[in-house]
Amino acid sequence: MRILLTNDDGIHAEGLAVLERIARKLSDDVWVVAPETDQSGLAHSLTLSEPLRLRQIDARHFALRGTPTDCVIMGVRHVLPGAPNLVLSGVNSGANMADDVTYSGTVAGAMEGTLLGVRAIALSQEYEYAGDRRIVPWETAEAHAPELIGRLMEAGWPEGVLLNLNFPNCAPEEVKGVRVTAQGKLSHDARLDERRDGRGFPYFWLHFGRGKAPVADDSDIAAIRSGCISVTPLHLDLTAHKVRAELGAALGVEA
């Protein structure tokens, strides 16, 4: 099985090293094409206004000045000697759940693999803070992902669907199981933090607050909060089919 790895945290990210160890438990034919720099939050964006610069690190490790989407295209269309059987994207530092999947470069890497006709999985690891220090239990994803991915590959899933895996913030032995979940809903609270530089000119940092919102029992959020691994199937068809029919009826046209 040939596996292509990418991420959005960049070629030097610890989560990418974790992902490679996971992949090597599944196959010896593992390739890495990852961004030169952090591409978090760039979602499914492409680089169209400047050239893509590819740097070969060794026989199977490449860094690209581009987005996760660019990396998957480069891997499938140029770097690999043949089509991969699986694209793995991650392991992201922090969960990618609910509405956040629309911003996620990690999920986008798997999305692009799916668009190219390759089975694809995004992996993210929840974490916590101790003071100002981020504590990421990478060992949890590393311990549980290989067997879970193997089982998922054996079971298979439809074309046009990618799988979004999130691992809870706990030790490997404290994981309480696996749940197949729905994409949850977060309270969206985007904020701008305005500051001044040394010359007095304004600049801004974008950040997100988290308001309280009901959490559905079958959601990815509920699974992670309960200490379970969340497996969420996501499809590329964004059509709201029920609303399509309703709009057709309201307009008196075929839908």
Curated annotation (Swiss-Prot):
Top-level division of the source organism's lineage: Bacteria
Originating organism: Brucella suis (strain ATCC 23445 / NCTC 10510)
Reactions catalysed, semicolon-separated, are: a ribonucleoside 5'-phosphate + H2O = a ribonucleoside + phosphate
Q: Which GO terms describe its cellular component?
A: cytoplasm
EC class (word): hydrolase
What is the UniProt remark on how the cofactor binds and its stoichiometry? Answer: Binds 1 divalent metal cation per subunit.
Alphabetical list of InterPro entries matching this protein: SurE, SurE-like_Pase/nucleotidase, SurE-like_sf
Q: Which cofactor does it need?
A: a divalent metal cation
What is the protein name stated in its UniProt record?
5'-nucleotidase SurE
Please state where this protein is localized: Cytoplasm
Keywords for the protein's UniProt record, in alphabetical order: Cytoplasm, Hydrolase, Metal-binding, Nucleotide-binding
Question: Binding of a divalent metal cation: at which residues?
Answer: 8-9, 40, 92
